Design a protein with these regions (language model features):
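Register-specific beta-strand positions within repetitive beta-rich fiber domains
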Residues: 10, 120, 129-130, 136-182
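Glycine- and small/polar-enriched repetitive beta-structure motifs of secreted/surface proteins
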Residues: 1-142
Length: 182
């Protein structure tokens, strides 16, 4: 292979010839089809296996980012993390079977077993079984948002523990909104 690559395992960096430098492939079929991708790290069976030209990806775990061919700056951590990504970029996928919402997704951060991202430029915490999200162990964290949306008949309960600073934001409830100047 071209200079400064490390390949350990059956068919790791197998196709690598003249292109691609500074790659690390550890595991059977890891970075197996890489031809011109640079600075990738693949640890695990078939990790980044279909990668051809993509650079700056990190796939740690069996089948992590296995279908990525041209997407850049992706991180997949866990069994089959990001295994649907083919051309998406800037995605962070943490947990077994985590995936962005589409193969060409951009800038999705997805955390938790079996969780699927919802939209580009978004963060998704937890799969459909998650019933609560805590921003701090003691619930003392401050959450900043430009808007807060409540769907259907959902409401904020326990108003003594809830404080919403409306000085520079809009609270969206259902199909309406609350004017912060009122």
């Amino acid at each position: 292979t071209k200079g400064q690559n490390i390949a350990i395992g059956r068919d790791a960096l197998k196709v690598q010839t003249d292109g691609g430098e500074f790659n690390v492939a550890v595991g059977t079929y890891s970075l197996d089809e890489n031809t011109f991708g640079d600075k990738n790290v693949a640890l695990g069976y078939v990790a980044l296996g279909k990668n051809t030209e993509a650079s700056y990806n990190t796939g740690i775990g069996t089948e992590s980012l296995k279908l990525n061919t041209t997407g850049t700056n992706n991180t997949g951590l866990g069994y089959a993390a990001g295994d649907v990504v083919s051309s998406g970029s800037q995605n962070v996928l943490i947990g077994a079977s985590t995936d962005p919402g589409a193969a060409d997704a951009t800038n999705q951060t997805v955390v938790g077993y079996g969780t699927t991202g919802q939209a580009d430029n978004s963060v998704t915490l937890g799969n459909a079984d998650v019933t609560a999200v805590y921003m701090a162990q003691d619930k003392g964290a401050t959450v900043h948002a430009a808007s807060i949306s409540l769907e259907n008949d959902e409401t904020i309960t326990n108003s003594t523990d809830t404080q919403i600073d409306m000085s520079s934001t809009t609270l969206v409830v259902g199909n309406g909104s609350v004017d912060p100047t009122i």
